[in-house]
């Protein structure tokens, strides 16, 4: 669940891209964006989540369907990034001695960050990449959008990165 407004419970923003985001090259890191509140109060918030882990994994996925507290839904898709390469927080957990490599999964990462909020946010900041979103006007029965701006088809679509696949 997400909220249209920031509240004590829903305090983690899902952002659209700012105008000054460069088309190529790097911008601020995840930690700089979040710790310095550079986007705060600029009207770039699409929604507010209650859990930073959900926002982090939404950024990894690149698109999703938001369900608001009032029951409405909104489709969002990739709207740009800060240009930094993704760095695995799972590998960082192994490097820090938190888990062995064979123990790490998305579920393990999510649970550990939720159990360790301060250290968890530090861990998420290990990944400097930050993804921005845009609202998508697509019917609810369609799947999430892929790199070609088409709805994905279960058991048929494959993940690609347009930087590497034309």
At which residue positions do the language-model features occur?
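Secretory/export targeting leaders with adjacent low-complexity proregions
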Residues: 1-138, 143-146, 150
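C-terminal soluble interaction/assembly domains
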Residues: 140-166
């Amino acid at each position: 669940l997400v909220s249209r407004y920031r509240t004590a419970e829903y305090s983690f923003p899902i952002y659209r891209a700012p105008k000054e985001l460069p088309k190529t090259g790097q911008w601020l890191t995840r930690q700089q964006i979040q710790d310095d509140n550079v986007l705060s109060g600029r009207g770039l918030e699409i929604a507010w989540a209650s859990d930073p882990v959900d926002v982090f994994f939404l950024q990894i996925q690149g698109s999703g369907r938001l369900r608001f507290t009032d029951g409405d839904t909104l489709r969002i898709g990739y709207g740009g990034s800060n240009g930094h390469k993704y760095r695995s927080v799972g590998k960082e957990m192994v490097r820090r001695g938190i888990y062995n490599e064979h123990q790490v999964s998305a579920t393990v990462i999510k649970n550990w960050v939720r159990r360790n909020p301060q250290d968890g946010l530090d861990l998420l900041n290990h990944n400097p990449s930050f993804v921005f979103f845009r609202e998508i006007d697509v019917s609810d029965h369609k799947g999430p959008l892929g790199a070609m701006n088409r709805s994905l088809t279960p058991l048929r679509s494959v993940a690609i990165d347009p930087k590497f696949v034309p």
